Amino acid sequence: MPEFEIQHTTRYIYEGTVRDSANQVILYPIVDDYQEVIRQEVTITGNPDVDVHTDYFGNQIGSFTYTDPHNVMVINSRVLVTTKHRTLPVNDIFPSHQWEDLKRLQTIVPYIDFLKQEYFEGLDELQEVVNKERNSDDTPYQIVLRFCQYVFDNFEYIKGVTTVDTKLDQIWKMKQGVCQDFAHILIEMLRILQIPARYVSGYICTNSNGMRGEGATHAWVEAFIPDYGWLGIDPTNNCIANDTHVRLAVGRNFSDCSPVKGVYKGSSNHKLSVTVSVDQESLPPGQHQVIEVPIADQVTEFTKNSYQRYMEMIQMQQQQQQQQQEKQLQQ
């Protein structure tokens, strides 16, 4: 049974002194029959109290506020987790029966959120691709594998061309991006055929080189297969997400699973850097591989924070209202 020690460090460097930093962290690995947390330590600059609760999707969410003036904030998670290999779906059930089972899920609350499509300009083109790639006698499992292959073959893995805010329109047009972009496209394809699909954030932990996303935060997809449950599928690497994938959170998209996000008061600009290291504990003595990779596409130069953008928006609205009032008085 694989055992991984993972260290995930998030560092904010502010252009000036800030305060009242309110943050949400999703750094607590999922615990279920196939994944177990042996121990975990989360440390944060200023040692604020962290309130941990479970969200709608079953993820463990930590919330904290750091009120003291500061110009640097570091959030560090160190966790030891074990994973268990899961057998693959048995593909011997009549396809028609499986598709009927999926139809029944369309009105069941836990699955509705994972069936909603996101409209974008290229949706009609994607619909054509889905129809072309699908065979009439395919099972949902076969569809998942084929669509995963399609994304892997037709999208180019390039860091830096997209951000977490990049829309499906841009991803579809460029046919380029990183793991979260590959995941979002595959999710949309599966939902077109009413296969429940959800976004997964976590880590990919292997002792061999060549896997995209290795040693860094990663994203993939889980698709619901009748008589099996949620199947992890990684379109970035065209593989089943099994015991080398450590899950942090699941949701409708990246926004539901962002490892760290928050707002603050003060200087409007900041710089963010993220590093992840993975040590595979199950390797024989002397053969431990520690991979430390700065996530280039998650490093942003000084940019305005959401609190500042919100205040600017409010100020703009007030100015517009004032101008309208002045015009009315002049009339």
Predicted features, each with a name:
Residues 83, 101, 105-177, 185, ...:
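Secondary-structure boundary elements
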Residues 78-117, 285-293, 297-308:
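Secretory-pathway-linked proteins and extracytosolic
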Residues 279-331:
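Alpha-helical and coiled-coil interaction segments, frequently adjacent to or embedded
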Residues 1-87, 94-97:
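Intrinsically disordered, low-complexity N-terminal segments that are enriched in acidic
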Residues 14, 81, 225, 278-280:
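Short beta-strand segments enriched in hydrophobic/aromatic residues
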Residues 2, 8, 21-23, 40, ...:
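Structural beta-strand/beta-sheet cores of well-ordered domains, especially the beta-sheet scaffolds
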Residues 25-27, 41-42, 59, 91-100, ...:
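Short intrinsically disordered coil segments
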Residues 149, 181-268:
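Hydrophobic/aromatic-rich core segments of domains that either
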